[in-house]
Amino acid sequence: MAASPGSGSANPRKFSEKIALHTQRQAEETRAFEQLMTDLTLSRVQFQKLQQLRLTQYHGGSLPNVSQLRNSAPEFQPSLHQADNVRGTRHHGLVERPARNRFHPLHRRSGDKPGRQFDGNAFAASYSSQHLDESWPRQQPPWKEEKHPGFRLTSALNRTNSDSALHTSALSTKPQDPYGGGGQSAWPAPYMGFCDGENDGHAEVAAFPGPLKEENLLNVPKPLPKHLWESKEIQSLSGRPRSCDVGGGNAFPHNGQNTGLSPFLGTLNTGGSLPDLTNLHYSAPLPASLDTSDHLFGSMSVGNSVGNLPAAMTHLGIRTSSGLQSSRSNPSIQATLSKMALSSSLKCHPQPSVANASALHPSLRLFSLSNPSLSTTNLSGPSRRRQPPVSPLTLSPGPEAHQGFSRQLSATSPLNPYPASQMVTSEQSPLSFLPTDAQAQVSPPPPYPTPQELPQPLLQQPHAQEPPTQQPQAAPSLPQSDFQLLTAQGSALTSFFPDVRFDQQPMRPSPAFPQQVPLVQQSHREPQDSFHLRPNPYSSCGSFPGTILTEDTNSNLFKGLSGGLSGMPEVSLDMDTPFPLEEELQIEPLSLDGLNMLSDSSMGLLDPSVEETFRADRL
């Protein structure tokens, strides 16, 4: 009797039965829970498939439409109006999409059958955010070999490649549909999906039975016919908003593409919503010069930064009393004028018997290097020996101060087939670089002064010139150039540059130069062999010519120029500073002409070594 109270709890058989009952009950609950979860999973998967079937014909982006899943969850077969209104908020309020019936009013029917909304959906889920089931019928489109002349290329060329610019394809105001008659109203709205460019060029689409339209043929990866491409190119670009044009590869590239329109119309691809700045073609503004005396030659006072204008600087053949001369260095830039900031007056006062032979004007400003053709500046003194280069744009005079600034500004190219320029004097044109073999006519491009503005224009025919005087061969290893530097009579130069006194002088190989010849002397002067082109020491600078400052390496390197520039408020030379005229480089902001020349792919960029040279000199 004493053991009876504890017999129930101490009996191992009853204890094991309780454990078995508990385990059985737990297993039943687990099975019920698993069955419930399986049912929920199946129903959820089925619901997602239905939602995906219904939404892929309206949702063209790659992001899931959360608002549509929330709004239309209770019903599985909504009308076409309710599902189509979601396109306005497809990008979560970021992009406003116009309604489809704004452009195609004939395609909307209020009494559509629920089963009709899947018919003819030829692009089922090419943009869907979730991977489709592989059991779906996927096949190659049967129209891959067709080329129908009725392609609606307006919307095809307006197609986009990113979600942020999908809204622009619906802004085409001219939907040219050859099938827009009454027979098309029997088709529901899903057929118009290709009009908005919502297929990303996939080769495989989920095909459903139903009539095919000609817009659906735009999925063909083969190149379009060339006549269709060229006929629709300008029209599609004109109807496109400017804010969505971005340069890049074409949406439908092919070998026969009309490349003649590309510099003016840009490319057809719009890979985003960034503005296209490559199609901006504004006329160049009038040059605003600080010097009022530059009004006649004002267009040459537009100086730009280093390397911006690749073919604009080496044409000036100006001989002043300082002997500034520039020779042609590149045959490919024979029709371009200089962008040099010649906005200062290079007034040189010839004083042959005084120590300060040439007093520079206070408003002297060195021209800014606007061309890779003039990467550095070469001023060669009266001594014809080779010297190590001084820093760029440093005017270094000779040891004899009374000789004046007789220098030669020459531009030589390491890869130029004609490194030596043949300098002759002529009485015809002040600034002419004419290839004698091509008999070309040099004409200024539009941004420069017109021939009506110039007293003696640059347009000179070769037959109007006298036969050039041959130069004695100074360096026998250098071949003579086809480009001849024609320096003209003083009257034409002074009328062309009103602020510059051009005093022509014969240059002799002796170290001391004679007195300067007056300006009225018209006869030909014998070109001396002191005018010879030295080879460019910067041979590693690629195909761009570089000229550098060379002078005697003695202690009197800067004495002559320091004496000549003494007392000038704007120009100060220091014997210690390697680049004394840094503040005098008037580098003006880049103009639209410079932008156009920069965007030209035919122009080459600066060599990295040349760029590093200027960066080292704090230019």
Swiss-Prot record:
Outcome (variant: S329A): Reduces interaction with 14-3-3 proteins without affecting the interaction with PPP2R1A
Tissue/organ expression: Expressed in brown adipose tissues.
Keywords tagged on the record: Activator, Cytoplasm, Isopeptide bond, Nucleus, Phosphoprotein, Transcription, Transcription regulation, Ubl conjugation
Molecular-function annotations in GO: cAMP response element binding protein binding
Record-linked Pfam families: TORC_C (PF12886), TORC_M (PF12885), TORC_N (PF12884)
Endpoints of the signal sequence: none
Effect of mutating S273A: Reduces interaction with 14-3-3 proteins. Abolishes interaction with 14-3-3 proteins without affecting the interaction with PPP2R1A
Recorded consequence of changing S391 to A/E: Abolishes phosphorylation. Abolishes interaction with PPP2CA and PPP2R1A. Slight increase in phosphorylation at Ser-273 and in the interaction with 14-3-3 proteins
PTM note: Phosphorylation/dephosphorylation states of Ser-273 are required for regulating transduction of CREB activity. CRTCs/TORCs are inactive when phosphorylated, and active when dephosphorylated at this site. May be phosphorylated at Ser-391 by MAPK3/ERK1 and/or MAPK1/ERK2 or by some cyclin-dependent kinases such as CDK1,CDK2 or CDK5. Following adenylyl cyclase activation, dephosphorylated at Ser-162 and Ser-273 resulting in its dissociation from 14-3-3 proteins probably promoting CRTC3 translocation into the nucleus.
Pro residues bias: start-end ranges: 443-454
Subcellular compartments: Nucleus; Cytoplasm
Domain of life where this protein originates: Eukaryota
Gene Ontology biological-process annotations: energy homeostasis; lipid catabolic process; macrophage activation; negative regulation of adenylate cyclase-activating adrenergic receptor signaling pathway; negative regulation of lipid catabolic process; positive regulation of CREB transcription factor activity; positive regulation of transcription by RNA polymerase II; protein homotetramerization
Modified sites of kind Phosphoserine: S4, S62, S162, S273, S329, S332, S370, S391, S396, S410, S443
Protein's UniProt keywords contain Isomerase: no
Entry-linked InterPro entries: TORC, TORC_C, TORC_M, TORC_N
Region named Required for interaction with PPP2CA and PPP2R1A: 380-401
The protein's assembly and partners: Binding, as a tetramer, through its N-terminal region, with the bZIP domain of CREB1 enhances recruitment of TAF4 to the promoter. 'Arg-314' in the bZIP domain of CREB1 is essential for this interaction. Interacts (when phosphorylated at Ser-162 and Se-273) with 14-3-3 proteins. Interacts with YWHAE. Interacts (when phosphorylated at Ser-391) with phosphatase PP2A catalytic subunit PPP2CA and regulatory subunits PPP2R1A and PPP2R2A.
Family: Belongs to the TORC family.
Function: Transcriptional coactivator for CREB1 which activates transcription through both consensus and variant cAMP response element (CRE) sites. Acts as a coactivator, in the SIK/TORC signaling pathway, being active when dephosphorylated. Acts independently of CREB1 'Ser-133' phosphorylation. Enhances the interaction of CREB1 with TAF4. Regulates the expression of specific CREB-activated genes such as the steroidogenic gene, StAR. Potent coactivator of PPARGC1A and inducer of mitochondrial biogenesis in muscle cells.
UniProt-recorded name of the protein: CREB-regulated transcription coactivator 3
Organism of provenance: Mus musculus (Mouse)
